[in-house]
Amino acid sequence: VINKNSEVYVAMENKEKNTSEDIKLGEQIILSGFQGLDGGSMVILRKMIGNEVRKISDKCEQFETIRLVLKKTHQTEASEVFEVNGNLTDNGKHFNTKVEERNLFLAVSKALEKLHHELEHTRHA
């Protein structure tokens, strides 16, 4: 399914680790577990993720892919905790992170920041 207002589509083929439930932003950004979110949240997340990934890719030797996996944990009627696992592949090297937060946007932002920091730390070492 292609959304003409953005470059987001749901992958319909099972390739590598991609499932039919994955959302792809362009060719290099894969989101898993984000399917049940409302449209307004997804608009904000797409902008936020796109901007941060652009900064990350500028620091990469050869940016390949970034994958974010969202899980809801410790869900109660009053609140929920969002777990975001991130995986960045740069020139064959893998960088991983895991963040848990009560705020979805903060969880995604922190996961991307941690990947960015890990990449910079490795490049300067």
Regions found by a protein language model. Give the residues of each.
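Polyanion-binding surfaces on beta-sheet-dominated domains and ring/shell assemblies
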Residues: 2-83, 87-125
